[in-house]
């Protein structure tokens, strides 16, 4: 229900080796469930924004150079994950007129787009309740992910794939760090 970003949380943990040595190994689906709660919370923050909040000047000021992107990826991720994540992160990186055009289009389409998204996305609490109902983990600590690591995964998950998700929209807007801080 959340644009693939939930899988990126799971993939991050799997690439780090989390739960792979358990008996039985930690289920991919359990990790995706926790990632889905996280991504639905991010979506909830995004959907609370107004078109006027999409500040082109702020977004342009927040654009990182390719060297900064590479440095951040390498600082955040394990060595075996770095090269591919650098390629993915640089592929998604947007700047200049392309970024301005993307934000202006988002501003123009936002009222209609936001209503369509609200109609199909679940609130994080609803996802938690459904996971509880079926006996699946519904909190990161239930899969041995502490709160600090969970927070860090919000940033790592954006780096590891080239698919464009809500995580990347918020990076493009220059507000992803603020959104994550509000969630924690």
PLM features per residue range, with description:
Residues 49-184:
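C-terminal charged capping/lid subdomain of soluble metabolic enzymes
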Residues 1-48:
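A conserved active-site cap/scaffold subdomain adjacent to cofactor or substrate pockets
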């Amino acid at each position: 229900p959340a644009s693939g970003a939930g899988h990126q949380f799971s993939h991050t943990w799997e690439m780090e080796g989390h739960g792979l040595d358990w008996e039985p190994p930690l289920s991919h689906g359990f990790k995706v469930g926790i990632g889905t709660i996280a991504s639905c919370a991010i979506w909830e923050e995004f959907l609370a924004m107004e078109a006027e909040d999409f500040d082109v000047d702020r977004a342009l000021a927040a654009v990182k150079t390719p060297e900064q992107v590479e440095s951040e990826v390498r600082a955040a991720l394990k060595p075996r994950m770095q090269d591919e994540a650098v390629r993915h992160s640089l592929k998604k990186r947007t700047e200049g007129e392309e970024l301005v055009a993307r934000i202006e289009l988002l501003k123009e389409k936002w009222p209609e787009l936001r209503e369509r998204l609200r109609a199909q996305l679940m609130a994080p609490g609803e996802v938690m309740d459904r996971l509880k109902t079926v006996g699946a983990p519904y909190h990161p600590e239930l899969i041995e992910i502490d709160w600090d690591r969970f927070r860090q995964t919000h940033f790592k998950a954006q780096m590891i794939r080239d698919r464009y998700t809500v995580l990347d929209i918020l990076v493009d807007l220059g507000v992803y760090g603020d959104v994550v801080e509000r969630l924690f």
